[in-house]
Amino acid sequence: MTEALRYVLFYESGNLSLAAENFPAHRARYEEFMRRGLLLSLGPFSDRSGSMAVFTTREAAEEFASGDPFVQHGVVSKWTIREWREATPG
């Protein structure tokens, strides 16, 4: 078993009626972080209460959230980062 330290960004939903108009800029931001190798995965919770994203560093998670159009325009009401020890076979 191998372990890697990851940082999980949790979003709580805010005004979801603003999501569609801000999604193109949000998508461009997460695609940039994926290209840079800083963002490993992301997605919403099925109950629409929020979403989560997994980053390689705390700094990347903070940088992402602070500049995310979803945060800046109220689609997200609150965000937090938690350290996670990812265990994988091998």
Where are these regions (language model features)?
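Conserved, structured core segments of small domains
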Residues: 1-90
